């Protein structure tokens, strides 16, 4: 996939997260999502808490890195620092994206720093 279209897709996730629209945010996640500790339903509850704490603040993604490879299908590993407006630092996150029905979906997300 083209790097620009991947950046646009990740930007769409960022905008959805900053908007506070849980339905929009969760549309980026696979129903098979797992954080290792949480399934899709529990993850949604975590996202709802996170988004309510942001209260519509802008989010910046710093040091965005996208690595793609093929295993059983196309996989993207996306790493970035998520910094909310008014903050100097934030969590470093890693997401794994896979294709489902031709669409990229997040099937794993975790904080790595």
Ranges and model annotations:
Residues 1, 90-113:
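Short beta-strand edge/turn micro-motifs at domain boundaries
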Residues 1-22, 27:
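Short, low-complexity N-terminal intrinsically disordered segments enriched in polar/charged residues
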Residues 5, 45-94, 112:
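Surface-exposed, charged secondary-structure patches
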Residues 24, 36-37, 87:
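Short, solvent-exposed loop/turn elements at domain surfaces
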Residues 27-28, 46:
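Generic alpha-helical secondary-structure signal
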Residues 28-41:
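A short gly/proline-enriched turn/hairpin at secondary-structure junctions
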């Amino acid at each position: 996939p083209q790097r620009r279209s991947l950046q646009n897709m990740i930007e769409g996730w960022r905008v959805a997260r900053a908007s506070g629209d849980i339905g929009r945010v969760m549309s980026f996640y696979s129903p098979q999502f797992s954080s290792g500790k949480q399934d899709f339903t529990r993850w949604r509850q975590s996202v709802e808490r996170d988004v309510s704490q942001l209260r519509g603040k802008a989010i910046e993604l710093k040091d965005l890195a996208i690595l793609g490879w093929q295993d059983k299908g196309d996989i993207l590993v996306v790493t970035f620092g998520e910094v909310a407006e008014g903050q100097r630092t934030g969590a470093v996150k890693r997401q794994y994206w896979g294709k489902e029905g031709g669409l990229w979906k997040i099937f794993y997300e975790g904080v790595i720093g």
